Each structure stands twice: as structure tokens, then as C-alpha cells.
Design a protein with these regions (language model features):
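N-terminal secretory/membrane targeting signals
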Residues: 4-41
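Glycine- and aromatic-enriched membrane alpha-helices
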Residues: 37-487
């Protein structure tokens, strides 16, 4: 028996050695494959990051797109019933103009390769292979910037409610989105001269909101006030027809701002967008409190419309610096933006400037304040960039360097956009016409411009008074007997 054990033992040892050899060989293969597997894993992670970044930018753009619903409700609530349908038509046309013109020329001027003043490549989104990969792709970046442009245009239209020809809106929108707005955007977001000087505007307090307010101001100066707004040298209240609609619009805008500011990181991975969103909400809360105090001081009452506008003013104010300031500073910036809105409303009335929705103080003055505030409240840890000349704010030991850069960036925007939009409004006035007739304004733009009522129940049709040929004409308003509802 003993003689038979050796072969068995040998066979066992041989089997063990064979298994060991296979193990070593397998380990060698695995070791040789580790770099490839690691590379594959890294590639997969990169693809995942790109997908997440793209998704974040697109979802943010969808939120910004939905802000148009907020503008619709806000402006409808502050307009009279006879103009509610005209507001709806204006908003949907605003979107059409913004997408088409930003696709045709706006994106190229704002973000195409060019010089320090404007871009000159990428007409009709033909970028010749250039990929804006920071946000997950060119298409996502284009969509996000197009809805920003639409917001700026919406600001313009709100101030000119109740008295402006629809054709004038269209002509202005084509030139504004196609040429004016994107050039200023290029100065900072397109890597232009302001960006190289260290000017900061994270999500558009000046680029989006101040530009829109400037165009609104020049437009209303050329247009003039609504009928009966100023009588005997004093401003007369022309209240809107629905504060709940207005406030619903404010809340939708507030929600949309999470995409407006949050997705301006242009990436979800490696970017602290939650910090941006927290600052945005804290500022809005501060704005409501500030506007409430301002309303008590100016009007001796808690004006609900001022409270809503205070929230919007604060959101505008924090938009430039939401990524650059600490939370406490966001509250202060929002509070001051809300606080100064009611006095500016009173000042505009004294100057006989008719701003039905308060866009000039809310988007203009708050936009200026928020852009300047970076030069005061931005800590060094968030802003210092020696290559771009960016420094800390005044209250963080940075001196006045950043404040000065912010100031002349604002001044350049005011000069460029103010002059060009004033010229454009004057050209429109002298050509297609800017203002509807007094009869049309009294009848309401719903019927005089669009041939229908936003609220049909507002008017009681007199039986037999409407021939079929005139049922949808501007003359219909004179044949309608107003109901007891307010117009």
C-alpha cells in the first residue's frame, strides 16, 4: 500500500502546483488589465459627470422657461381686465422671438469666438465643431442662455402694459434679442473685456435684469404714461384687477429662480449649487421684510404688491453675487433691495414715469445694487483671481478695486443699452408706430389689438348689436355694455 502512496501524493502536489500556476497566471492577467479597467472606469465616470451636468443645465433652463408663466400672472394681475389677453399674447410671442433670434444671431454675438466686444461665429448655432462642454454640451448651453434672454425681454414688455402696439413689441424684440442683449452678455459671459477686467455678474443682475429695465425705462419715456395716470399734476392709482394672480406669479418666479441662479454653475458635479440656492432664498426672504418696512414708511400700510415686488427685487439683487457672498450678506443684500423699492416707486410717480408693474425699481435699481454689492460683501476666498484682477470686497479688506470694476461695468451697460434702446424705440415710433390710439386704449388691447376678450364675461353682448362682419373687430368694444365688474 505504501508503494501506492507516492504517486498519489505526487499527483496531489502536482495538482496544487498546477492550481497555483493558474492562480499566478490569472493574477498576472488581472494585473495587466487593471490599467485598462481603471481607464474604462474613469471614462465611465467622465461620461456620467457630463450626463449629470447636461441634465442639471437643461432642468435649470426648464425652470427659467417656466418663469414666463410667472411674468404672465404677475403682469396680468397688475393690469386691468380689458388688457389681460394682450399680456398672454405678448408672453407667448416673447418666447418665439427669443428662441428664434438667439438661435439666428444672439448666441453667436454673445458666446461665439470673436473679439473682446462681440462674438462673430456660430450663426444659426453653426459653431464649426466648438463644444461648450462645461455645461454638458452646446445645445444645453444654448437652451439655457436663450431662456435667460427671454427673461430680459419680458422685463421690457411689462413696463409698457396697456398702451403699446403689439407690432412695436415684435420689432423691438427682434433687434433687442438679436443684437443688443447678447453684445453686453459677451462682455462678461463670453469672455469679453469686462470679464478680463475682473467684472463679476454670476447670473445676470446687470446682464439680464438691468438691461431689461433700461430698455423698459427708455421705452416708457418715449411711449408716455397711460391715459388718466397723471391728472392735476399728481399720479393717480390705476390698480390691477387681481392681487392673487400677481402673487402667484411672484411665487412662480421665486421657484424659477432656483434654476436661474442654481443652474448658472453650468455643472452639477464639483459645483456647490446648493450654496447658491440657499443664498438666493435667504435674499428673497430678506427682500419681503425690507419691502414691508419700506411700504410702512412710504404708504403707512403693508402693501401686498410691494411685498411681492420686494421678493423679486431681492432675487434680482442676489443674482449677481449668489455664488460670491456668505449667507448673512445675502440676507442684507436682499433686505436692502426690497427696502429701496417702494421709495423708487414714489420717485418715479413724482417724475411722471409710468411703470405699471414696478420693473424699473425691481429689475433696474435692484440690479445695480446687487452688482455693486459684490464689491462690498464678497470674501477673498470666493473671489480672488490674480489672473483676472478679481479681488475681495471692501468689507473683507479688498479695498475699493472690485467695487470700482463693478461700478464701471454697470456704467458701460447703462450707456450702451440705454442709448441703443432709446434710438430703437424712437425709430419704431416714427415708423410702425409705438402707441395705440386713445380709443383703443380705452377699449382695451384685448379687443382692439387681438379681437377677443381675456375675460369674455366682463362684457354683456347686446342682442343683435354685433354684425358677423364686425364681431371680432376693434369696433366691437363700443357696442359692448360693460358689466358691473371692474375693468
Amino acid at each position: 500500500m505504501g508503494g501506492n502512496h507516492l504517486p498519489v501524493l505526487y499527483q496531489g502536489v502536482s495538482s496544487m502546483r498546477l492550481r497555483s500556476l493558474w492562480t499566478v497566471a490569472a493574477a498576472g492577467v488581472l494585473l495587466l488589465g487593471v490599467p485598462g479597467l481603471a481607464a474604462a472606469q474613469d471614462g465611465s465616470l467622465v461620461e456620467t459627470d457630463i450626463a449629470l451636468n447636461t441634465l442639471w443645465v437643461v432642468l435649470g433652463g426648464v425652470l427659467v422657461l417656466f418663469m414666463q408663466a410667472g411674468f404672465l400672472l404677475l403682469e396680468t394681475g397688475l393690469s386691468r381686465m380689458k388688457n389681460a389677453g394682450a399680456v398672454a399674447g405678448k408672453v407667448i410671442m416673447n418666447l418665439a422671438i427669443a428662441f428664434l433670434m438667439f438661435w439666428a444671431t444672439g448666441f453667436a454675438l454673445g458666446f461665439g469666438e470673436g473679439n473682446n466686444f462681440l462674438g462673430s461665429a456660430g450663426w444659426f448655432l453653426d459653431l464649426g465643431g466648438i463644444d461648450y462642454g462645461a455645461g454638458g454640451g452646446t445645445e444645453a448651453f444654448f437652451f439655457f442662455q436663450a431662456v435667460f434672454a427671454a427673461v430680459s425681454l419680458a422685463i421690457v414688455y411689462g413696463t409698457m402694459l396697456d398702451r403699446t402696439k403689439f407690432a412695436a413689441y415684435i420689432v423691438f424684440g427682434i433687434v433687442y434679442i438679436g443684437v443688443i442683449y447678447p453684445i453686453v452678455a459677451h462682455w462678461t459671459w463670453g469672455g469679453g473685456w469686462l470679464a478680463q477686467d475682473g467684472f463679476l455678474d454670476f447670473a445676470g443682475s446687470s446682464i439680464v435684469h438691468l438691461q431689461g429695465a433700461l430698455a423698459a425705462l427708455t421705452g416708457t419715456l418715449v411711449l408716455g404714461p397711460r391715459l388718466l395716470k397723471f391728472r392735476n399734476g399728481k399720479a393717480q392709482p390705476i390698480p390691477g384687477h387681481s392681487i392673487p394672480l400677481f402673487m402667484l406669479g411672484v411665487i412662480i418666479l421665486w421657484v424659477g429662480w432656483m434654476g436661474f441662479n442654481g443652474a448658472s454653475t453650468l455643472a452639477a458635479v464639483g459645483q456647490n449649487f446648493a450654496d447658491v440656492i440657499v443664498n438666493t432664498n435667504l435674499a428673497a426672504a430678506g427682500g419681503v421684510i425690507g419691502a414691508s418696512i419700506g411700504s410702512l414708511i412710504m404708504f403707512r400700510t403693508l402693501d401686498v404688491s410691494q411685498m411681492g415686488n420686494g421678493a423679486i427685487a431681492a432675487l434680482v439683487g442676489i443674482t449677481a453675487g449668489c455664488a460670491f457672498v456668505d449667507p448673512w450678506a445675502a440676507v442684507v443684500i436682499g433686505f436692502i433691495a426690497g427696502l429701496i423699492a417702494p421709495p423708487i416707486v414714489v420717485l418715479l410717480d413724482k417724475m411722471k414715469i409710468d411703470d405699471p408693474i414696478g420693473a424699473i425699481p425691481v429689475h433696474g435699481i435692484a440690479g445695480i445694487w446687487g452688482t455693486l454689492a459684490i464689491g462690498l460683501f464678497a470674501p477673498a476666498a470666493r473671489t480672488v483671481d490674480a489672473d483676472l484682477g478679481v479681488s475681495a470686497g471692501l468689507f473683507y479688506g479688498g479695498g475699493g478695486e472690485q467695487l470700482w470694476v463693478q461700478f464701471y461695468g454697470i456704467a458701460a451697460t447703462i450707456a450702451f443699452t440705454g442709448v441703443l434702446t432709446l434710438i430703437l424705440w424712437l425709430v419704431i415710433k416714427w415708423t410702425v408706430g409705438l402707441r395705440v390710439s386713445e380709443d383703443q386704449e380705452m377699449a382695451g388691447l384685448d379687443i382692439s389689438e387681438h379681437g377677443m376678450y381675456g375675460y369674455p364675461e366682463q362684457f354683456i353682448e347686446v342682442p343683435g348689436a354685433f354684425p358677423e362682419s364686425t364681431r371680432h373687430s376693434a369696433g366691437m368694444a363700443s357696442l359692448a355694455r360693460p358689466s358691473t365688474m371692474s375693468d
